[in-house]
């Protein structure tokens, strides 16, 4: 497991209504913790696929996804390892835009996200639609770095950050839930930071 700098300077900010329970403000830092080696993804060969229970399975290459209408997220992110980072800006494309192109079959209820490394995570469909999720390639106006999931990652900022799969390459829509990597290893199936859904059995 790789750990990088940023797990210092803890500010608990008691009473701050932007800080979920059990979290600390990481300030200017952005800690990283991964269960695998950081890949160097080539944008010339990278693709993003949305398939499964959709009307039109679609794959975009790097140029193709950049040609879609852009969208940005400004707000906070929260990691299950207890850090939170305020006032982040990510730029990319809304997942809603991708699903408008592919269509969604009525029986779809969940999404299984897969990274180029084989990492997986599961999400309810409701957690990536209606302006809640993005495919992003910029952070604060600069290309997303590999250790933070670059060149492109999933962003689901209202859930703990392991749900925002780094090095994303596929979203498969399904009619059932299936646990991903961390979920199979004891982490919560949904991961709402405001409910402290860190581990299996949490509310």
Where are these regions (language model features)?
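Structured, non-membrane catalytic/scaffold regions adjacent to prosthetic-group chemistry
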Residues: 2-203
């Amino acid at each position: 497991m790789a750990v990088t700098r940023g797990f210092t300077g803890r500010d608990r900010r008691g009473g701050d209504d932007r800080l979920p329970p059990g979290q600390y403000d990481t300030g200017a830092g952005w800690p990283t913790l991964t269960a695998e080696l950081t890949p160097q993804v080539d944008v010339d060969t990278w693709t993003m696929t949305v398939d499964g229970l959709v009307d039109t399975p679609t794959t975009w290459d790097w140029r193709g996804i950049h040609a879609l209408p852009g969208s940005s997220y400004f707000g906070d992110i929260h990691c299950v390892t207890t850090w939170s980072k305020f006032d982040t800006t990510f730029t990319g494309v809304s997942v809603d835009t991708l699903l408008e192109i592919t269509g969604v079959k009525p029986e779809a209820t969940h999404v299984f996200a897969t990274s180029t490394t084989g990492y997986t995570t599961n999400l309810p469909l409701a957690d990536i639609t209606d302006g809640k999720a993005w495919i992003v390639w910029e952070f604060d106006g600069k290309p997303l770095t590999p250790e933070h999931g670059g060149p492109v990652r999933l962003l689901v900022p209202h859930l703990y950050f392991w749900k925002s799969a780094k090095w994303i390459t596929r979203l498969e829509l399904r009619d059932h839930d299936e646990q991903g990597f961390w979920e199979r290893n004891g982490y919560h199936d949904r991961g709402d930071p405001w409910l402290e859904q860190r581990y299996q059995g949490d509310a």
